[in-house]
Curated annotation (Swiss-Prot):
A motif (Nudix box) lies at residues 128-149. Coiled coil: none annotated. Belongs to the Nudix hydrolase family. DIPP subfamily. The active site is at residue 143. Residues 91-239 form the Nudix hydrolase domain. This is mRNA-decapping protein g5R. It comes from African swine fever virus (isolate Pig/Kenya/KEN-50/1950) (ASFV). One of its GO terms (molecular function) is diphosphoinositol-polyphosphate diphosphatase activity. Mg(2+) binds at residues 134, 147, 169. Its cofactor is Mg(2+); Mn(2+). InterPro entries: NUDIX_hydrolase-like_dom_sf, NUDIX_hydrolase_CS, NUDIX_hydrolase_dom, Nudix_hydrolase_domain. Keywords: Early protein, Eukaryotic host gene expression shutoff by virus, Host endoplasmic reticulum, Host gene expression shutoff by virus, Host-virus interaction, Hydrolase, Late protein, Magnesium, Manganese, Metal-binding, Multifunctional enzyme, RNA-binding.
Length: 246
């Protein structure tokens, strides 16, 4: 069993117009299933059940992209112009060995055609993988700024709150650890701009927005990742924090 850990920061504000607590969510540019397939994180077993499940969790456009058998386009969809040539060469060789050499992609296309429905691009809390020797909190702070553009001095960490969630995909366990922060007063305005112009944000994210609890519940009902068990307790913590603060 492989363990993959990501660290995130739930950052909240009190919307001064609606008088509701909101948090920042980001929508990824590609599905986890698509990324796992392109990076060859799968096993080829006799019935291919895990692969078909991966294809089920991809968007229709991602499945169509794989059916072109053009690995350069698949790789570019994730990495855009990031120069990772050594990793690209390694993954391309594995893709070619698995799918192109045996039958020029016929088996792969047949498996994709067995997929039913379509996955969605996840809305999630800004998070990422820690670097070597990086603490959990330092990782959460760095990833949050990379994905939102909001600097460390613009919010306050609430150290008493820390939550985690785990789920399994095939032989991989995904563990997410979350810290909590509240925005400074000057950034609570409803129309505070969230920009996608920063290079890292363009590469990883398609949308970024403030969401209240009603929106979080709606999003969670329409995607595989349920955010409510994490964001619900965070909002309750913020309510108590603001009550005692004032």
């Amino acid at each position: 069993m492989q363990l993959k850990t990501s660290i995130g920061l739930i950052t909240c504000r009190m919307n001064t117009q609606s008088n509701q607590i909101e948090t920042i969510l980001v929508q990824k540019r590609y599905s986890l299933a698509f990324s796992e397939f392109i990076h060859c994180h799968y096993s080829i077993n006799s019935n291919h059940s895990h692969l078909i499940k991966m294809f089920n969790n991809m968007t229709i456009n991602e499945r169509l992209l794989i059916k072109t058998l053009d690995f350069d386009r698949m790789w570019y969809h994730i990495w855009i112009e990031t120069p990772v040539y050594e990793l690209y060469h390694k993954k391309y060789q594995k893709f070619k060995k698995n799918w192109l050499i045996p039958d020029n992609g016929k088996k792969l296309i047949s498996l994709i055609n067995q997929a039913k429905g379509s996955g969605t691009l996840l809305w999630e809390i800004p998070k990422g993988k820690p670097k070597e020797n990086e603490s959990d909190l330092a990782c959460a702070i760095r990833e949050f700024e990379e994905e939102t553009g909001i600097a460390r001095e613009d919010y306050q960490i609430l150290p008493a709150f820390k939550k985690s969630m785990s789920y399994f995909e095939g032989k991989t366990e995904y563990k997410h650890i979350y810290f909590l922060a509240v925005l400074c007063k000057s950034l609570e305005e409803p129309n505070m701009n969230l920009s996608l112009q920063y290079e890292t944000r363009i590469a990883e994210i398609s949308k970024i927005s403030w969401q209240n609890m009603e929106a979080v519940r709606f999003i969670s009902k329409h995607q595989s990742l349920n955010l409510e068990p994490i964001i619900g307790p965070a909002f309750n913590f913020i309510k108590n924090y603001l009550r005692y603060k004032h």
